[in-house]
């Protein structure tokens, strides 16, 4: 078996599209998100659906050619690890000055093209999200970057990572730290099934006349 072939789909993929698993000393399956744990590994497509299928169909034992113990909530365990990694990197980006929060500052970062990605708390009101989305569309219309937006965490978790309270909207700014955050948010979003592809939405509206009005 190719060492970068998903044990569920049997298809090869880039490592960023896969999650590596190894067997620990206690014969338990362990997710290796950093791909640096010793021992033989197997690979699963990097989304919850395929991880759950691998566990349910006993595919880990088949891949490792020995009986292994699969944690009952392996899918949830991987989700938690990805979320913790994303929030930890977000906190580091804040310390590096690469995050702003608050609707006004976020909108300004979008319109200036400084924002790399947007984070909305799960509790974010539709009106606040809509205003920032208008700014994103207008930025694309004027030839600026298409900025992705994610709604992956509740306000309490965003606030804890960013050292603030009532953090509903945040912008991660273009920088090395911002790129590291983006990589982890993309991985978490993919694992959870992916957000609606608003990049396509942004491209579709880029030529609309009313997009220019959003800038005003």
Where are these regions (language model features)?
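N-terminal cysteine/histidine-rich coordination modules
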Residues: 1-66
